[in-house]
């Protein structure tokens, strides 16, 4: 499932993040690339040791944990500490697949990567090129979202970032270990939750809505890994 989640950051949060990122000290992004991806990666990144990194991470984690659509789609067990990168002057990231296991330096623990996310800090009209291209069983998807919006997709997806030929593209990228390991099970639960919420809006807490909700929570109980 590939999902666009709009307005993850408020206007105030977005403005603060952009102002800080515009003054940040950027380093070579190859530092965090895995063996498979290191030759494909051509961008800049905030160092994990930079105090700004943890400050921005707190803003993003707070925003994600208070976003109902994100919670419904990801069913997160753990949000691996976000990273931040910048593309300019032809910067790009060739085809790659994210590592299946990542170590979170803040938590001092390894986590499974079920879901990958990119949160945009720059609007599409601020740069040329820089499309994120995600390939899955349904085809190829080009992604270039408004600032403050997020794209969510399975970490097993082949993806790339096209060269930025003009302007600057800044994003945060992160991974989620979900309570639900299987992508198709997460998709089933997401669609079921959407149906329940829609029924509640249109008809209130009727018997059918309650019954569906019971089945939803039974599936969560059956499929979740805690």
From Swiss-Prot:
* Entry-linked SMART domains: P4Hc (SM00702)
Give the GO molecular function terms: 2-oxoglutarate-dependent dioxygenase activity; iron ion binding; L-ascorbic acid binding
Q: What is its EC number?
A: 1.14.11.-
- Regions annotated as coiled coil: none
What are the UniProt keywords, alphabetically?
Dioxygenase, Iron, Metal-binding, Oxidoreductase, Vitamin C
Does the entry feature the keyword Iron, yes or no? yes
GO biological process entries: DNA damage response; intracellular iron ion homeostasis
Lineage, opening ranks: Bacteria, Pseudomonadati, Campylobacterota, Epsilonproteobacteria, Campylobacterales
Query: What is this protein's record name?
Result: PKHD-type hydroxylase Abu_0724
